[in-house]
């Protein structure tokens, strides 16, 4: 059964949709500035800025050199349950041949498998 809150016209969808411009801008910025694994310094800074704007409770940096972990505390601490979400941030050593305003500004590097999108959405 489908919950009406999750339909394209539902409340949850409308709430998430209000962030579309910011998420699109972040994804395009990450796409334009690709970095190989363990070199994601710019990406890490941008992700940290976005997490701070979201008001996460804690941000731990330097995980696996360039990774981050954000802690969001739920309203109820009684269950002890936790959920972990993750996204890769690295790009690939591939030349980008797309021609749009947010194409890679780094010769021979691009986000070719969606890590920019995964990072922005998470």
Whereabouts are the PLM-identified features?
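Acidic/His- and Gly-rich active-site-bordering loop/insert found
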Residues: 2-111, 120
């Amino acid at each position: 059964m489908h919950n009406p809150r999750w339909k394209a016209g539902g409340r949850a969808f409308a709430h998430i949709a209000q962030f579309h411009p910011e998420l699109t801008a972040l994804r395009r910025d990450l796409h334009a500035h690709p970095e190989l694994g363990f070199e994601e310094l710019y990406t890490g800074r941008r992700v940290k800025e976005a997490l701070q704007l979201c008001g996460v409770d804690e941000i731990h940096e330097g995980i696996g050199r360039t990774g981050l972990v954000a802690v969001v505390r739920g309203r109820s601490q009684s269950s002890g349950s936790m959920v972990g979400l993750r996204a890769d941030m690295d790009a690939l050593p591939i030349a980008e041949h797309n021609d749009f305003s947010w194409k890679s500004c780094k010769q021979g590097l691009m986000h070719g498998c969606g890590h920019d999108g995964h990072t922005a959405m998470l």
